[in-house]
Structures are given as structure tokens and as C-alpha cells.
């Protein structure tokens, strides 16, 4: 039986709820990850007093690990079969660990410098993995929400707008909230703010889970195996060029960031 539902068969109320729910997923991602992008390097170097070069190397290593986990999570989503669909469960079960990982990244204990660096490695790798867990499904779920190309464009627009809104909220309020809540103690302030944004992010991910529906599922299409996926990447010249470009981009970014600290 064909599970696809045309936009005309769905109520306007459902369409708007689904658009909002889909957008809230990226709102949550950016509300949490934007703090990481903007302030984690500063937190590690100026608040926790870790070496900028050590942190730059750590970020580079994590980017390499990310390249692997992105493929693995995508493969796992493709193999997921639940009554909620393939992608939706990842929002439900990934939300809290992602928020907790972000909180832990800003909760470096007062131990030796080597211990702090080891803690930073462990928490940042965990955080990056959990970001992959909740972010990759935002891309994989879109084709299953509708088979109407115009509606997919509308959904993508809602996603980008709410992602921008989440990033803007962080850029406009985070440092002020850190000063207010920490009362001069930046370490405490970052923990409190990350906890606040993490809670809001969790609620948004849960709303994404409850408001969207995977209807356009095609179970009869043969999925590639993990080995086939990896082999295809090795033969994909544009992908290899893109990967090298991304590596140089991140290297330049972190070298520049290190020089500014």
C-alpha cells in the first residue's frame, strides 16, 4: 500500500504544525551549538586556561572523527525501523544526551592541566557525536515528510529561518546572560547559560518529535551496505575534493582563532 500523502490531503493545521516542528529541530541545534561555536574556544583558553595550540589540535582531531561518525549515523538511521519511523526516534532519544554533553563541555573540573585537557577531549568528542545524532536526522527526515517538492521547499525555509533565529538569540544574549548569572564568575555563568539553553533545546527536540510525521516511507528500495557506502566515497572525486577543502578550511579557522587568543 502506498504510504505517501499529498499536500492536498493534509489539513492546513497539520501542515503548519509540521513546518513549525521541523524548524524547531534546527532551532534547538543552533541554540545549543552556536554557544559551542562562538565561545567554547574562549572558555577553554581564557576561563579554564588550556593551551590554544592543544585545543586547536583537539578540534582538528574531532573533525576527523566527525567525518567517520557522520557516515555511521547516516547508515544507522537508514537501518532504523520503528513505529515512529526512521528519523523521528533520534530526536526523542538524542535530545537529552546532546544537552547534557553541551553542559559537560562547560563544566571542566578543577584538576591538573593534563586532566583538564583529557576531560575536554572526552566531552567534546561526545558532544560532537551527539550533535551528529540529532542533526543528521533533520536532513534524512525531509523526504519522508512529503513527496511534494514545493512543500519540501517550504519546510526547508522554516528550518533555515528558525535555525537563524536560534543562532541570533545566542549571539545577542549569551555573554550578557553569562555575566548576569555568573556574577563575575564566567565558569559558573557559562554552565548556567548552557544548562538553560540545553533545557529549551530539549523541549524543542521533543516538539519536533511530536509534531512531524514520516509518511513518505519507501521500504522496498534496497539500501546500500556500509561497505558499499565507504567504497563509493573512495571513488567519488568531488567528495574527496570537498573533504580536503573542508579540512583546510577548519585548519585555517583554528589557526586564526589560536592567533587571536
Protein language model features and the residues they cover:
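Membrane-embedded alpha-helical bundles of multi-pass transporters/translocases
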Residues: 2-261
Amino acid at each position: 500500500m502506498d504510504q505517501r500523502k499529498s499536500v492536498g490531503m493534509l489539513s492546513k493545521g497539520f501542515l503548519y504544525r509540521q513546518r513549525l516542528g521541523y524548524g524547531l529541530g534546527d532551532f534547538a541545534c543552533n541554540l545549543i551549538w552556536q554557544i559551542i561555536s562562538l565561545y567554547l574556544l574562549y572558555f577553554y583558553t581564557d576561563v579554564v586556561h588550556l593551551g590554544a595550540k592543544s585545543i586547536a589540535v583537539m578540534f582538528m582531531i574531532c573533525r576527523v572523527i566527525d567525518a567517520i561518525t557522520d557516515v555511521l549515523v547516516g547508515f544507522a538511521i537508514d537501518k532504523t525501523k520503528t513505529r515512529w519511523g526512521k528519523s523521528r526516534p533520534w530526536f526523542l532519544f538524542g535530545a537529552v544526551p546532546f544537552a547534557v554533553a553541551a553542559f559537560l563541555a562547560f563544566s571542566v573540573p578543577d584538576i591538573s592541566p593534563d586532566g583538564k585537557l583529557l576531560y575536554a577531549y572526552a566531552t567534546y568528542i561526545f558532544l560532537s557525536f551527539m550533535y551528529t545524532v540529532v542533526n543528521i536526522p533533520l536532513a534524512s527526515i525531509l523526504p519522508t515528510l512529503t513527496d511534494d517538492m514545493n512543500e519540501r521547499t517550504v519546510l526547508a525555509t522554516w528550518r533555515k529561518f528558525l535555525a537563524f533565529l536560534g543562532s541570533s538569540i545566542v549571539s545577542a544574549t549569551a555573554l550578557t546572560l553569562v555575566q548576569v548569572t555568573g556574577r563575575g564568575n564566567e565558569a559558573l555563568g557559562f554552565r548556567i547559560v548552557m544548562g538553560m539553553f540545553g533545557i529549551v533545546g530539549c523541549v524543542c527536540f521533543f516538539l519536533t518529535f511530536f509534531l512531524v510525521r514520516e509518511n513518505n516511507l519507501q521500504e522496498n528500495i534496497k539500501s546500500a551496505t556500509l561497505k558499499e557506502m565507504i567504497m563509493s566515497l573512495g571513488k567519488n572525486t568531488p567528495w574527496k575534493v570537498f573533504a580536503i577543502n573542508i579540512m583546510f578550511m577548519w585548519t585555517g579557522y583554528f589557526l586564526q582563532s589560536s592567533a587571536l587568543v
